[in-house]
From Swiss-Prot:
InterPro entries: ATP_synth_B-like_membr_sf, ATP_synth_b/b'su_bac/chlpt, ATP_synthase_B_chain. Belongs to the ATPase B chain family. This is ATP synthase subunit b. Pfam families: ATP-synt_B. One of its GO terms (cellular component) is proton-transporting ATP synthase complex. Coiled coil: none annotated. It is a single-pass membrane protein. F-type ATPases have 2 components, F(1) - the catalytic core - and F(0) - the membrane proton channel. F(1) has five subunits: alpha(3), beta(3), gamma(1), delta(1), epsilon(1). F(0) has three main subunits: a(1), b(2) and c(10-14). The alpha and beta chains form an alternating ring which encloses part of the gamma chain. F(1) is attached to F(0) by a central stalk formed by the gamma and epsilon chains, while a peripheral stalk is formed by the delta and b chains. Its main location: membrane.
Length: 170
């Protein structure tokens, strides 16, 4: 209860002095706190903010440099991609040319082999025909030479008369 009495007495003294207890009106404490705040603000502005600003500026510079490097890398990649596409197109054209030449050469080799084989077949057929003709002529000559003797032998067997004698011929 003493505390309440002391508070009421303090309020009464303040009212007697003519001061009002309005918190919106600045008093000495406010100016003291304002002075301390300004000192702290000056200390922070002098010793804390410049290093932070320096670090932030360095970071901004690094970010800008990284962006420039990324842009340069993207341009180099695009140029390399274009070179790659160009080289691939040239390689495809060259491969197509090689493939076309190989097919043409293959067709030529096949046609040459076919012509050679046909020539060999024709030559073999001609040789076979010539050999058959020679054998036929030889057999024909042999048969003509032996036809008289064979017919006499055959007649002798069938008829039973010897036809090779001069009496039978006349």
């Amino acid at each position: 209860m003493d505390d309440v009495n002391s508070i009421v007495l303090a309020a009464g003294q303040a009212a007697e002095e003519g001061g009002t207890n309005n918190f919106l009106v600045p008093n000495g404490t406010f100016f003291f706190v304002l002075a301390i705040f300004l000192v702290v603000l000056a200390v922070i502005g002098t010793f804390v903010v410049p290093p932070i600003l320096k670090v932030l500026r360095e970071r901004d510079a690094m970010v800008a440099m990284t962006l420039a490097d990324n842009k340069k890398s993207a341009e180099q990649f695009a140029a390399a991609q274009a070179d790659y596409e160009k080289a691939m197109a040239e390689a495809r054209v060259q491969a197509s040319s090689y493939r076309h030449n190989a097919r043409a050469e293959g067709r030529k080799v096949v046609e040459d082999a076919r012509a050679h084989a046909e020539q060999e077949v024709a030559s073999t057929l001609q040789q076979a025909n010539e050999q058959l003709k020679r054998e036929r002529d030889a057999v024909e000559l042999d048969l003509r030479a032996n036809v008289g003797a064979m017919s006499a032998t055959l007649a002798n067997r069938i008829v039973g008369v010897d036809v090779t004698t001069p009496a039978a011929a006349g």
